[in-house]
């Protein structure tokens, strides 16, 4: 076999009889030198909680070395110096790489809403004879070479039921078809110019289609009309993907990133060591916070970590005071600890809990019964939640920038008109949740029955209890008939027309309040899609509705 190969190379003019490379061979090899590399580092790394609140995933350290620096050094070792790093989340922390390694940073500001296919779309002109990889890999040995003769994608010999590809008899990667376990996909690839250009054309089409907002770049590589790509197989464990806190701990228990503030808080509150904190799972990303589930000494808990900019939005001392008032009353979730300085909160996990379905009349009826029961406790705290003060405050956080809405000044003036009307209305002045939205009503099966617990009391304060009805409606994005149905669920005895009009006014005011809140969060890179638009529409539409009802009432009185 070897002799046959040698003779073939000599026959083609690549080897001399003295077994030395010919000039023709050197010219051919020069054509197959990798030109550049792309490292995808824009995403949140959501499963890396709690580390990702402080450090982007590419800068996680193993044995004192950031993951992305190890990849860059391995690329430099094979003489690949032209490196593009696509950044987004905490992009500023990657800037030092420009000075240290001469990399080029490419910014993808869509990282919060779209997957890494859209990051790759930012560097399509650079693709061709290119290494492509995510930033969160740790390679024991250098997976790169000075010469590459064909396109390949790196997989391990481990079988993975979630993988969409498997290695064929020709050592090509083909769809697993769902019938067989595929090979574990690692994410590193080498793309020759023909394969790269073919894939780039597909990506240009895919990014125009919202159906592909959440897909990985591999969907473009392995498309049905794509060129075949060879498999490059490494043993299981040769490349370690670090997607979770526990994976990092397994690889390097002394990593500095394991010493996060959130983990230190858990250790302090529960009097445990870090090794006793296991089963860490990210929960859904909230509108204000990020939370994760964990196990410790047989119990399950949730750690709440405040999100971007919340220190300007929420008074954590006031939140702690609310929880002290609620303690032992069976109204909220069971609080283990709340830190009034940084907002870290630990609660016991409610097994089997589900949130209210705002489209289910039985759920809504049960939630309104719970809400009214809470209001009728007539609890009190020392602070209030002023709707109009908060509207002005959220606007002040824009730091002089105009609203994104052209008619904001008119809309704001209309909403402020409602202030005098609301001031004159009778109120049920009590501790009010303020954020009594469907997602904050938890249904819990307990002792053969169902309990409802209200969670997330960050905004709670003294206010008219009927504000909570308005908040439920606008978060659920109810139309007018649904709003009226909810009001009727709360007022089982019947709702006086003047109270109904007052609630409509609260819908207008609260709509502008949360619209301003969304505008501030948008300036931090956090977007809420249709929700923000609907809040602004509530401000406009329900102002008009209130004005019509008041005019009709005045006409009847005359």
Please tell me what each predicted stretch does.
Residues 3, 17-37, 184-268:
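Conserved alpha/beta core of the MobA/IspD/sugar-nucleotide pyrophosphorylase nucleotidyltransferase superfamily
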């Amino acid at each position: 076999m070897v002799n046959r190969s040698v003779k073939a190379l000599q026959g083609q003019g690549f080897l001399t009889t003295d077994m030395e490379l010919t000039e023709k061979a050197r010219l051919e090899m020069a054509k197959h030198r990798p030109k550049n590399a792309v490292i995808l580092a824009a995403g949140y790394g959501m499963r890396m909680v709690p580390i990702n609140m402080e450090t982007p995933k590419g800068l996680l350290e193993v044995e004192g070395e950031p993951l992305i620096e190890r990849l860059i050094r391995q690329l430099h070792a094979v003489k690949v110096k032209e490196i593009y790093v696509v950044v987004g989340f905490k992009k500023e922390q990657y800037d030092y790489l420009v000075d240290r390694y001469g990399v080029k940073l490419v910014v993808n500001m869509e990282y919060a809403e779209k997957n890494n296919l859209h990051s790759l779309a930012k560097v399509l002109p650079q693709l061709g004879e290119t290494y492509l990889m995510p930033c969160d890999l740790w390679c024991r040995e250098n997976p790169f070479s000075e010469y590459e003769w064909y396109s390949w994608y790196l997989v391990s010999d481990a079988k993975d039921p979630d993988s969409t590809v498997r290695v064929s008899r020709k050592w090509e990667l083909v769809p697993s078809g769902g019938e067989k376990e595929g090979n574990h996909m690692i994410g590193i690839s080498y793309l020759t110019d023909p394969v790269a250009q073919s894939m780039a054309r597909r990506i240009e089409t895919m990014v125009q289609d919202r159906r592909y907002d959440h897909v990985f770049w591999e969907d473009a590589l392995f498309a049905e009309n794509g060129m075949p790509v060879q498999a490059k197989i490494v043993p299981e464990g040769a490349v370690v993907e670090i997607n979770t806190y526990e994976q990092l701990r397994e690889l390097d228990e002394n990593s500095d990133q394991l010493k996060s503030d959130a983990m230190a808080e858990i250790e302090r509150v529960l009097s445990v060591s870090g090794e006793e904190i296991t089963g860490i799972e990210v929960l859904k990303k909230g509108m204000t916070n990020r939370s994760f589930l964990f196990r410790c000494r047989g119990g399950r808990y949730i750690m709440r970590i405040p999100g971007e900019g919340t220190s300007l939005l929420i008074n954590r001392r006031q939140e702690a005071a609310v929880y002290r008032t609620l303690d032992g009353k069976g109204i909220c979730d069971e609080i283990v600890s709340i830190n009034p300085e940084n907002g870290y909160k630990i609660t016991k996990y409610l097994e089997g809990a589900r949130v209210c379905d705002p489209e289910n009349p039985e759920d809504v009826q049960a939630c309104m019964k719970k809400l009214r029961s809470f209001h009728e406790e007539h609890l009190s705290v020392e602070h209030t939640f002023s709707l109009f003060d908060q509207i002005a405050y959220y606007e002040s956080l824009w730091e002089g920038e105009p609203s994104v809405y052209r008619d904001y000044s008119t809309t704001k003036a209309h909403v402020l008109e409602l202030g005098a009307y609301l001031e004159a209305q009778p109120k049920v002045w009590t501790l009010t949740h303020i954020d009594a939205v469907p997602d904050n009503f938890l249904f819990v099966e307990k002792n053969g029955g169902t309990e409802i617990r209200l969670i997330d009391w960050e905004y709670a304060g003294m206010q008219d209890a009927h504000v909570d009805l308005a908040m439920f409606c606008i978060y659920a994005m109810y139309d007018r008939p649904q709003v009226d149905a909810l009001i009727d669920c709360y007022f089982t005895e019947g709702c006086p027309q003047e109270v109904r009009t007052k609630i409509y006014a609260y819908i207008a005011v609260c709509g502008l309040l949360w619209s301003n809140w969304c505008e501030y969060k948008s300036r931090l890179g956090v977007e809420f899609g249709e929700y923000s638009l609907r809040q602004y529409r509530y401000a406009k539409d329900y102002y008009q509705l209130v004005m019509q009802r008041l005019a009709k009432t005045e006409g009847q009185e005359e």
